[in-house]
Every structure is written in C-alpha cells, then in structure tokens.
C-alpha cells in the first residue's frame, strides 16, 4: 500500500476538509478522505478543454470552474488565442496558494500566464453575475452531477445552474461539464433549457479502460 504524506490541508466553513498529499512524484487532492483528483489521471480533463474550445467559435472569453491541479486550465490556455481572457473560479483559496507553491510545475505554471484571471469564490456566483459574458464555460468542480465535492454544488447541475450557464453564454457558446460517469437526468435537463447536447466517453488516461464522461452543451446561435 502506498504511503501518502500530507503536504497541506484546509478546512472550509461547512466542515469539508481538503488535503494535498504526495507520494514520490504523485499528487492527489482529497476531500473528506475521498480522492477528488490526481496528477496520474488527468487526460480526460485535458480532453474536456480540447473538445470545448474546438466546438466554440474562436473563443476569447472562457470561464473555468475549478482550478484543482491546474490541468484543465493549462489545456484551455494551450488552445485559445493570445488575446483571449481565461477566468478560473476557485472556491478554496488554499488551492490557489498550493498551485503557486507546489503544483504549478506540473502544468507549466498556468496561473502565471498573462491571459489568466483568478476569482476566489463560488463559480456559481461568477456565472450568475455574468450575462452573455463567456464563449465557453467549463465545469470541473466535482466528480460529476451526482458525485459532489460539496452539497451546495447541486445548484450548479439543477435548474438554477443550467439556467445561469445558458444566460452567461454568448451566441453559439459551449458549456462543457466533466463527469466520472453518465447521467441521463442531467443530459435531459440540459436539453430542456435549449442546449444542443453531445455526450462523449473518453479515456480516464492514455491506455486505460476506465472512461469518464464529457457533456458538451452548445447554446443556439442568436442575432
């Protein structure tokens, strides 16, 4: 059994404990003892960014919900133009600090990219106050609509969140959501708000049989 050393930890107001742990060159973030992300399994997060940016019309304003280990943010920055603005909303300020202090080397320090803007706070609030502000919104804050890191994130995947995401997207904008597994109810909910939805199953990592699910929901073009 691997022995993981706790490098940093943080406790949120709701009592949730976030732990950054390391074993040799492996890093994980745990929430309440459950692994939320690992630097040894991030290919599907990168696929989320690549597919979302490819579906959008030359996106210049992108919102990434959840910083984590930085892989989704790095993949977005690698795909967008030099004059794009990429905002990353992260609820846990310690995660931002850990990326600066420990994790940036894993992804070539994406927080130092001049196109990157960091908002410390709930991504739902950022979406809610940003009508027609983004060409692409990526949500990688949980293990999917059913496996939540925090209970209040349910609003992101329910009517309030889907409605807010639709309103925050520009014409032909793309909402891209990472999930550990399929969710027919969420698929139908996206369609009920007028999104054109594509669901992709992608490898959790290169060579793995494990699959993760990407929801790619596109807003209809408008005048």
Residue positions per predicted region:
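Glycine-/small-residue-rich active-site loops that bind phosphorylated ligands and cofactors
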Residues: 36, 182, 205
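A SAM-dependent methyltransferase catalytic signature shared across enzymes that methylate proteins
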Residues: 183-202, 218-223
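Glycine-centered, phosphate/nucleic-acid-interacting loop/turn motifs that mediate DNA/RNA or nucleotide
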Residues: 173
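Short amphipathic beta-strand/extended segments with alternating polar/hydrophobic composition
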Residues: 36-42
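N-terminal auxiliary segments of SAM/dcSAM-dependent transferases
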Residues: 1-30
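Active-site beta-strand termini and strand-to-loop segments that position acidic
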Residues: 21-23, 217-220
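The AdoMet/dcAdoMet-binding core of the Class I SAM-like
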Residues: 42-169, 177-178, 193, 198-215
């Amino acid at each position: 059994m691997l022995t993981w050393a706790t490098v940093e930890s943080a406790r949120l107001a709701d009592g949730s404990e976030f732990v950054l742990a390391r074993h040799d060159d492996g890093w994980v973030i745990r929430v309440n003892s459950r692994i939320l992300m690992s630097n040894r399994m991030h290919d599907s997060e990168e696929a989320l960014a690549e597919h979302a940016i490819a579906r959008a019309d030359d996106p210049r304003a992108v919102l990434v919900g959840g910083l984590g280990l930085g892989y989704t943010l790095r993949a977005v920055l690698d795909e967008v133009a030099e004059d794009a603005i990429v905002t990353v909303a992260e609820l846990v300020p310690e995660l931002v600090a850990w990326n600066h202090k420990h994790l940036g080397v894993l992804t070539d320090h994406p927080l130092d990219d001049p196109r990157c803007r960091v908002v410390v706070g709930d991504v739902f609030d950022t979406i809610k106050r940003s009508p027609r502000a983004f060409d692409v919104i990526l949500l990688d804050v949980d293990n999917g609509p059913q496996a939540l890191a925090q209970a209040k994130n349910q609003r992101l995947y329910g009517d309030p969140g889907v409605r807010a995401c639709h309103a925050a997207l520009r014409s032909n904008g793309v909402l891209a959501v990472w999930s550990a597994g399929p969710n027919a109810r969420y698929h139908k909910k996206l369609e009920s708000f007028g999104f054109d939805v594509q669901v992709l199953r992608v490898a959790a990592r290169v060579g793995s049989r494990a699959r993760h699910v990407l929801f790619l929901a596109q807003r209809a073009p408008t005048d």
